[in-house]
């Protein structure tokens, strides 16, 4: 979309969140009979015609616009009154758009039972559940693995890796965290010595850790 051409969008695209709905609606998909979107934010909001079939694979209703709004607003950079108030207004508008735009989808597919419940609660619609595929022939337990717990995740607020870190700070069990994200530095600051951050790892390395 046009957002990728805006200043600093490569590393700070989330700053343009208020523009996401407008951006997704600019895509011209008129030459396609079938539209399949994969959405945790705005992808489901593409505009289609009555003659097109739109199937959307949903990973979640827009978390930061619904039940996890306050988690995002608790970030230190958002706590100033003026910024916080403005973001609350923006997120409330996004919540309205998130709800209204679901009528554009003909068939909703949820990636889990939990997501299906969220779709029903926030959008009032039923969905079919298809779990994300995992190559179980490739990802198998490593009999030579070390004695530690493993977490593989994006380090973003909604994943609540901070709760994991706080729990292992108290348990003192060894924990390895794989993943990158804006929360990484804050998590490293609160983590004890029993917790190790490896950053991004290829599947080959994750397989060894498993």
Where do the protein language model's features map onto the residues?
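Active-site donor-binding segments of glycosyltransferases and PAPS-dependent sulfotransferases
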Residues: 1-44
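Active-site proximal beta-strand in glycosyltransferases
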Residues: 34-37, 48-79, 128
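Membrane-proximal helix-turn-helix segments that form the acceptor-binding/catalytic region
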Residues: 74-108, 116
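Acidic anion/phosphate-binding donor-loop and adjacent secondary structure
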Residues: 117, 121, 128-129, 133-147, ...
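Conserved donor-binding/catalytic core segment of Leloir-type glycosyltransferases
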Residues: 134, 140-176
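Nucleotide-activated donor-binding/catalytic signature segment of Leloir-type glycosyltransferases, i.e.
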Residues: 185-208
């Amino acid at each position: 979309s046009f957002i990728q051409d805006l200043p600093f969008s490569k590393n700070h695209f989330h700053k343009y969140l208020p523009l996401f709905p407008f951006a997704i609606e600019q895509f011209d998909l008129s030459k396609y009979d079938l539209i399949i979107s994969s959405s945790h934010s705005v992808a489901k909001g593409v505009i289609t015609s009555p003659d097109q079939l739109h199937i959307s694979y949903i990973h979640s209703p827009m978390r930061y616009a619904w039940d996890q709004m306050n988690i995002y607003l608790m970030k230190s950079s958002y706590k100033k009154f003026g910024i916080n108030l403005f973001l609350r207004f923006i997120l409330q508008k996004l919540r309205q758009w998130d709800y209204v735009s679901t009528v554009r989808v003909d068939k909703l597919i949820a990636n889990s039972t939990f997501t299906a419940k969220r779709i029903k609660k926030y959008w009032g619609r039923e969905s079919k559940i298809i779990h994300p595929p995992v190559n179980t022939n490739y990802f198998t337990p490593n009999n030579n693995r070390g004695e530690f717990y493993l977490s593989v995740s994006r380090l973003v607020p909604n994943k609540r890796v901070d709760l994991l870190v706080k729990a292992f700070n108290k348990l003192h069990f060894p924990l390895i965290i794989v993943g990158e994200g804006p929360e990484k530095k804050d998590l490293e600051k609160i983590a004890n010595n029993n917790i190790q951050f490896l950053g991004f790892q290829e599947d080959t390395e994750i397989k060894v850790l498993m």
